[in-house]
Swiss-Prot record:
Subcellular location per the Swiss-Prot or TrEMBL entry: Cytoplasm; Nucleus; Cell membrane
Quaternary data: Interacts (via its PDZ domain) with GLS2. Interacts (via its PDZ domain) with RTKN (via the C-terminal region); this interaction facilitates Rho-mediated activation of the FOS serum response element (SRE). Interacts (via PDZ domain) with ARHGEF16. Interacts (via PDZ domain) with KCNJ4 (via C-terminus). Competes with LIN7A for KCNJ4 binding. Interacts (via its PDZ domain) with CTNNB1; this interaction inhibits the transcriptional activity of CTNNB1. Interacts with ADGRB2.
GO molecular function (one): beta-catenin binding
Signal peptide start and end residues: none
Sequence positions bearing Phosphoserine: S61
List of residues that carry N-acetylserine: S2
Topology of this chain in the membrane: Peripheral membrane protein
Gene Ontology cellular component annotations, sorted alphabetically: actin cytoskeleton; cytoplasm; fibrillar center; nucleus; plasma membrane
Keyword Phosphoprotein: yes
Physiological role: May regulate a number of protein-protein interactions by competing for PDZ domain binding sites. Binds CTNNB1 and may thereby act as an inhibitor of the Wnt signaling pathway. Competes with LIN7A for KCNJ4 binding, and thereby promotes KCNJ4 internalization. May play a role in the Rho signaling pathway.
The PDZ domain, residue ranges: 15-112
Protein name: Tax1-binding protein 3
Amino acid sequence: MSYTPGQPVTAVVQRVEIHKLRQGENLILGFSIGGGIDQDPSQNPFSEDKTDKGIYVTRVSEGGPAEIAGLQIGDKIMQVNGWDMTMVTHDQARKRLTKRSEEVVRLLVTRQSLQKAVQQSMLS
């Protein structure tokens, strides 16, 4: 993803901080992911050219920690707590997100809709 002067901006970078919800022994994030370098990118509904092997948000639980933090379906996860997520397997991404020792997850995501990103930032 790069920007060429004079061209419209098609994606923005967002920081999202999710405070995990404790349910018994579990810490809940409230979202699901898809993708990874070990997955078939042609099956990714969020990849524009069907070759992107990134990690994408595929579901956000209504009222859950991720929704409260502003995470959206289709967001591409670039970093988790400073760790690069651009070339990881699905399982590596899942493990990084669900580390028990981390009650807060700080994500760096790219979002395809500039209009949605601007609306979200105005609500915060």
